[in-house]
Amino acid sequence: MVGRAAITPPDGPVSLFQNNEEIMGIIMDRKVEFSTLVRAQPERVYDSIATGEGLDGWFTTGATVDPIAGGEIHFRWKDHGLENYTGENGGPILEARRPERFVFRWKADSGSYLTTVEIDFTPVASGTVVKLMEYGYEDSPVGMQDFLNRVTGWAQALTLLKFYVEHGVKY
């Protein structure tokens, strides 16, 4: 088994408010959660996710990352995967603490709202445990599809990360 995954069950929709005004609409109380062991030091694993050069090694083509809170992350894919996907995504970086934690926001697959991705890197004797959580999906049919797409997408992405860092295999 490459890692462990959990889909947090819904406890009902949540509405986010600021000064009694709705700012994001109704969101699902569902989270994509994955964790996997990567047999490498936390700095190496972190840099493979939180730098443009690192992302381009295994996942993207031409990614850019300003790895500070308030910076931006920008993913670019060209002819990626079986569908030869070409596209871009990105958003603000909320937290960047090398080699422990990286948090950013980016567009859901539908492109109509942002989700939050939190990635923690925990050193263990045999390498680094990468724990990823993504949340903030709209409570709608489109939001559910975005959620399901990310469940499968992150499963593939963390497997690709593991194979790249441990064995130098690039997809």
What is each of the regions a protein language model found here?
Residues 13-65:
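Hydrophobic ligand-binding cavity/cleft-lining segments
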Residues 33-34, 40, 53-88, 92, ...:
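Short beta-edge strand/loop motif at the mouth of beta-sheet-based domains
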Residues 36, 89-94, 115-123:
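Hydrophobic/aromatic beta-strand elements that line small-molecule binding cavities or substrate pockets
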Residues 45-46, 55, 73-75, 93, ...:
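Hydrophobic pocket/interface hotspot
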Residues 109-156:
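Beta-strand/loop substructures that line and gate deep hydrophobic ligand-binding cavities in soluble
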Residues 163-171:
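Short, highly charged C-terminal tails/helix-capping segments
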